[in-house]
């Protein structure tokens, strides 16, 4: 009788063990466990924003909007100098004829990680992808193919210089600090 119970237990254990064989372990990096949306809505304090920044790096970016729950992005930031205010430089991709220094976009399918940002802009007519390293960053912007394309770079309190294969600029912050940018298309 003990042998039958032992064999039945072994058979059931083997059957249950075989059921788990279809699952596989996904190798995840530590960055996959970070949720940049934690702590973004506060009813008592000023809200913070989901931030894209590597530890101890010079660049910090977050989607520029009035608050976390708004439906519009106010352009795409190039660099943010603190955790709750506007960016030092602003980039606005555009297709159309109404050019403004900063363009408000409706957006969808936003995806943030600590080192990248991806969003579809203006009713999915444009897609912006942003990746950063410690001292530089890369924007990739995909447009509709059949319309003229414009990219507007804005410096609120500074200047922009357009060269043959580069764009450079500086902006004066409120505490007499200069922020410089060098962009290659």
Residue map of PLM features:
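Sec-dependent signal peptide recognition
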Residues: 2-9, 13
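C-terminal motif of bacterial Sec signal peptides marking the signal peptidase cleavage site
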Residues: 17-18
